[in-house]
Structure formats: C-alpha cells, structure tokens
C-alpha cells in the first residue's frame, strides 16, 4: 500500500485567502445573506403588524360610523312621498317610466329593484326612501375612509411611525369628520327622501376614495385598473346626476401631484385647463352627441334604406365598441400606456 500511495498523483491544497478556503467563503456568504434577510424581516415585522391592526380597526370603526348613519336615516326617513320631485321619481321608478329631462335612468332601475321588495303598493315609497338612506350611509362610510387615508398619509409623509396614539388620532379624525357630515341639515334632508342627490353623493364619495386607493398604489404595475374603474363608475353616475363630473378636477390634481416630482405653478395651471377640458368633453360631447349621432344613423337606416327600427343604432353601437376596443388593443401592443388608459376610460364612460 505504501508503494501504491507513492505512485498516486498529488492533489495540491486549494489556495487560502484571508484564512478561509473557497468552500468556507461560499458558506459564509450565504450565511451573511440569510442574516440580512432575517434582519429585514424582523425590522419590517412590527410595521406589518401595525398596518394590519390599523386596517382592522379602520374597517371596524368605518362600519360602525356607517351603522350610526344608516340607523339615523332609516329612523327619520319619509314614510311616504314628499314634496318636490320625490313623488315623480317614485312613480316613474315603480312603473319604469320617463322622468323629467334630462332623466335619471340608473336611479330609476335601482329604485325599481327596491320597489320589488315592497310587500304591497303602500310600501313602495318607503322602499325607495330606504334605498336612498342606505346610499347616504355608504357615502358616509367612504367619506370616513377618505379622511383616515389622508390622515395616515400625512403621518407617513412626515416620516413618523403609525403608533397606537397616531392610529387612534387618525380614526378619531375620520369619525368626527364623517359624523359631522352625517348630521348636516342639507345632507340629512336629502338622505331620507326619494331624490337623486343621495345616490349621486354616494358615487361622488366612492370615486374620490377609489382615486386615493390609486394614489397609494400608483407605483404598482396594475394601478391603472383603479382609473378604469373610476371612469366606469362616473359613466354610471351620469345615469343618476351629472353632479359627479365635478370630481374630475380633484382627480386630475391627485394624478398630477402623485406623478410629478417637482410641482410648479405651470403644472397646476395645465392641470386646471385639462380638468376643465375633460368636463366639457364629457358633458358637452359624450353625453349629448353620442346619443344624437346614433339617432341620426338610425333615422337614415330606417327612413332612407328601409331597414328595421333600431338597426342603425345597433350598427352604430357595434362600430363604436369595436373601434374603441381595437384602438385600446393597438395602444397596448405599442406600449402607449397613457393612450391606452384614455381609450379604456372613454369606453367605460360610454
């Protein structure tokens, strides 16, 4: 055996650097990386726990405020039809008829669903009023979440941690603001009767809250879905009242301040101009001329070409959907993100 060992090739010892062999250095490198990962997880663990606790209490207090508003409005709502337009809205909703111009088709359909829950015709006005009371309570809920979101963002912008004291300060501010609006005379007056302003206020509060949700997730890959959802809800709100269009300037300013690193007076001026142009585009072009153009095509197809009624408006709707869909797809394929969002938002509004 000694002779055989002498004939075997000699393996040189691996080079040693800093007192460590290559294998040991690799083990120490992995060990260092694992230690860093654990340190980061340990540092972020209290923050994650605090955010989960904040979100839990934010939901609990928010729904408690909603319950206070809902019970208040349901306890004080009009038992029957009240003065002004409420009687007309209740009657047209129950029979799905046409109300006074410019109309409120979405309100009529939602109120019709509410009247179907009435045990008899005597309770039809009560069900419409109850629907408005619940819509007003949801407006208060979204207002509470809006205030708490802004309060939490103020603390985070100042570099301060969300301690228990800060958390309850934010929740208290949201409760005070939401409940103060709950018992205001103007809002309470419209919350217990069958008018369109309660449902319109709910859409307004929902749209603003969703825009703040986008603001919090603006750097994530799929954050634009919030903007598309907002456009869809604004399109629905047109079927209740066009008052919701007044949210557009606020949404534009939130987008500008979130996406701009350096805020200037010129940028603020351009944001004002763009928001005004969007209001004019939706209110003076999309709302009236989309229906008018479809009616003109239908008249041409029926009176000139002798085609069946609604053939022109059907073809117009299909061409509009296909055209906007193809344009949005082409913008997506070419990487035109902003153009794609604009086209999708326009489609949702329509």
Stretches found by the model and what they are:
Residues 55-83, 181-183, 241, 279-284, ...:
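Transmembrane signal-anchor helices characteristic of membrane glycosylation enzymes that use polyprenol
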Residues 74-75, 121-129, 156-170, 174-201, ...:
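Aromatic- and kink-enriched transmembrane "portal" helix at the membrane-lumen/periplasm boundary
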Residues 77-89, 99-111, 126:
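Extracytoplasmic catalytic/substrate-binding loops of multi-pass membrane glycan-assembly enzymes
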Residues 164-168, 207-227, 253-263, 325-327:
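Membrane-interface transmembrane helices that cradle and orient dolichyl/undecaprenyl
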Residues 222-225, 261-273, 305-314, 330-346:
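Membrane-interfacial entry segments at the cytosolic side of transmembrane helices
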């Amino acid at each position: 055996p000694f002779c055989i060992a002498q004939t075997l090739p000699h393996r040189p010892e691996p080079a040693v650097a800093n007192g460590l062999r290559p294998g040991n250095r690799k083990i120490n490198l992995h060990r260092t990386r694992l230690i860093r990962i654990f340190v980061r997880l340990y540092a972020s663990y209290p923050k994650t726990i605090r955010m989960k606790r904040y979100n839990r209490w934010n939901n609990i207090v928010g729904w408690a405020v909603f319950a206070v508003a809902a019970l208040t409005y349901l306890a004080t709502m009009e038992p029957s039809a009240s003065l002004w337009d409420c009687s007309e809205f209740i009657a047209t909703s129950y029979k799905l008829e046409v109300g006074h111009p410019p109309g409120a088709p979405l309100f009529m359909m939602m109120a019709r669903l509410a009247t179907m829950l009435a045990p008899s015709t005597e309770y039809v006005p009560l069900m419409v009023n109850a629907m408005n009371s619940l819509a007003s309570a949801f407006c208060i809920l979204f207002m509470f979440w809006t205030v708490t979101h802004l309060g939490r963002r103020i603390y985070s912008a100042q570099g301060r941690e969300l301690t228990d004291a800060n958390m309850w300060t934010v929740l208290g501010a949201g409760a005070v603001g939401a409940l103060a609006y709950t018992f205001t005379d103007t809002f309470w007056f419209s919350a217990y009767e069958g008018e369109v302003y309660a449902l319109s206020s709910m859409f307004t509060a929902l749209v603003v809250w969703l825009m703040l949700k986008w603001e919090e997730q603006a750097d994530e890959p799929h954050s634009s879905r919030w903007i598309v959802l907002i456009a869809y809800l604004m399109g629905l709100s047109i079927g209740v009242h066009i008052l919701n269009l007044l949210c557009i300037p606020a949404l534009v300013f939130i987008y500008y301040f979130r996406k701009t690193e350096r805020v200037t007076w010129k940028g603020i001026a351009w944001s004002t101009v763009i928001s005004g142009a969007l209001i004019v585009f939706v209110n003076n072009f999309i709302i009236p001329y989309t229906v008018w153009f479809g009616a003109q095509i239908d008249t041409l197809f029926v009176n000139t070409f002798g085609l069946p009624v609604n053939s022109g408006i059907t073809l117009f709707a299909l061409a509009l959907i296909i055209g906007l869909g193809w344009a949005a797809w082409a913008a997506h394929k070419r990487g035109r993100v902003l153009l794609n969002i604009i086209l999708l938002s326009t489609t949702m509004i329509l």
